[in-house]
């Protein structure tokens, strides 16, 4: 098979998937490569895993509310390992679905990394370390971004980005979430509904700064109702690990 394509896409997340399907529908020969998981951040570390976890916490919270209207359900318990298995299964199904969409569209799929060596050439290396050079008339870079870690903050098992928080093995007794955009707010709701003490810190004067102000205000009230300690207009000055936990300075 020829190693020349009309379009090579580096990154199999939402942007790469949409571009590959559209270009293939236009009759172009497409190669898309992905090193970390089909569907990208949304599928593996963002929208889909958070929604899977929120479905669990919402169900637990709903069971507790039934008692208020006279419906007894026994003592509700939390099996966090089972919640994680549910999350992983949902993510697996979504990733397989993303890959199938590409295959059904006639897009050539490559798992591995891509190294750009010229405006039209890429070295594609698969997980086994085997490489080949591919060329294209056009190149789309859609490899996404990484979470920003404030200067002076070192990541560890207890200090992590949003990429890592969804993969922790045990439910914490308390958690500090720095950043009140949609991912931070989703995790604040999830942990609060499971009874975790949550502190949500935002540098700007309101949560969800990119969303409608009235909606953000309503959601803040809901967070407070859940017991979340919401602190806006608060700059993170430092984090330190101690034997007792993580200490935050704002």
Residue ranges, per PLM feature:
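Rossmann-like NAD(P)H-binding beta-loop-alpha module
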Residues: 158, 169-211
């Amino acid at each position: 098979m020829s190693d020349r394509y009309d379009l090579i896409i580096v990154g199999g997340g939402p942007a790469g998937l949409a571009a590959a399907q559209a270009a293939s529908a236009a009759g172009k020969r497409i190669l898309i490569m992905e090193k970390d998981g089909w569907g990208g951040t949304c599928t593996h570390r963002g929208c889909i895993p958070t929604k899977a976890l929120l479905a669990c916490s919402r169900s637990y919270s709903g069971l507790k509310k039934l008692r208020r209207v006279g419906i007894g359900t026994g003592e509700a318990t939390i099996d966090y390992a089972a919640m994680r298995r549910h999350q992983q299964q949902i993510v697996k199904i979504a990733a397989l679905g993303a890959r199938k969409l590409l295959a059904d569209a006639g897009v050539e799929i490559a798992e591995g990394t891509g190294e750009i060596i010229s405006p039209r050439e890429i070295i594609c290396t698969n997980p086994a370390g085997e490489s080949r050079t591919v060329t294209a008339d056009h190149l789309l870079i859609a490899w996404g971004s990484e979470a920003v870690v404030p200067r002076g903050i070192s990541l560890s098992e207890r200090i992590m980005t949003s990429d890592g928080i969804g993969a922790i093995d045990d439910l914490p007794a308390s958690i500090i979430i720095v950043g009140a955009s949609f991912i931070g707010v989703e995790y604040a709701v999830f942990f609060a509904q499971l009874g975790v003490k949550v502190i949500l810190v935002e540098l700007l004067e309101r949560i969800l700064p990119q969303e409608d102000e009235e909606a953000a205000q309503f959601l803040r009230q809901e967070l407070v109702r859940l017991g979340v300690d919401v602190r806006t207009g608060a700059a993170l000055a430092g984090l330190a690990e101690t034997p007792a936990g993580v200490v935050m300075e704002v």
